[in-house]
């Protein structure tokens, strides 16, 4: 829980700068893009050099947040920062809320039909208020297994977790990124990958 709180604070801190931009939407996009690039680079580099540990990730994030805030305040005139109140885009806000609730209920409060791998074609079961915290689809299980392998081995996700054999991973960037976020926030990917999935899919929507 402590790792989660610290991680969320450090992830949210750079977004405070969005309130300083005259065009706050553009500022938010800039900051969000910076965070994606930074965490992806941090994941790949630390895993490549075998130093993919929580202490390293935490230290890098603390340093990055400090440098970003210091650099932004130093160059505030160049970027025309403004302390005007943030105007909420209610349409985007409502869409985000609906998206989160819709995706959340699939895993944590699902009512409807479902089938399983060993069921016959068009054979369905009924569920009411069902809670299933694990990944649903094969690609999600695939991502979880490789990301956990990266965390456990402190290296790039290039080994088959079933037999420890090397293979070319075409989704190495995504799996490295997921592993870094999970390590940074102290998440158990087996039971909490769905939370990351909800967040990512909400952004895509």
Language-model segments: which ranges?
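Membrane-embedded, hydrophobic transmembrane alpha-helices
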Residues: 1-87
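Active-site lumenal/periplasmic loops and adjacent helix-entry segments of GT-C-fold
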Residues: 98-205
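Internal/C-terminal transmembrane anchor helices
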Residues: 83-107
């Amino acid at each position: 829980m402590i790792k989660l709180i610290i991680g969320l604070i450090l992830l949210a801190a750079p977004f405070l700068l969005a309130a300083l931009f005259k065009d706050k939407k553009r500022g938010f996009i800039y900051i969000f893009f910076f965070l994606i690039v930074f965490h992806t680079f941090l994941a790949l580099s630390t895993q490549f050099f075998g130093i993919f540990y929580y202490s390293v990730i935490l230290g890098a994030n603390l340093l990055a947040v400090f440098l970003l805030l210091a650099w932004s305040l130093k160059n505030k005139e160049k970027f025309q920062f403004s302390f005007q109140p943030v105007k909420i885009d209610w349409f985007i806000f409502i869409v985000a809320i609906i998206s989160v609730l819709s995706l959340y209920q699939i895993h944590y409060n699902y009512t409807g039909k479902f089938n399983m791998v060993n069921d016959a074609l068009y054979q369905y079961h009924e569920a009411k208020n069902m809670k299933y915290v694990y990944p649903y689809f094969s690609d999600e299980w695939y991502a979880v297994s490789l990301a956990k392998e990266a965390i456990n081995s402190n290296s790039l996700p290039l080994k088959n977790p079933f037999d420890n054999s090397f293979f070319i991973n075409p989704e190495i960037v995504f799996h490295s990124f997921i592993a870094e976020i999970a390590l940074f926030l102290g998440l158990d990917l087996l039971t909490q990958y769905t939370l990351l999935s909800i967040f990512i899919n909400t952004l895509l929507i």
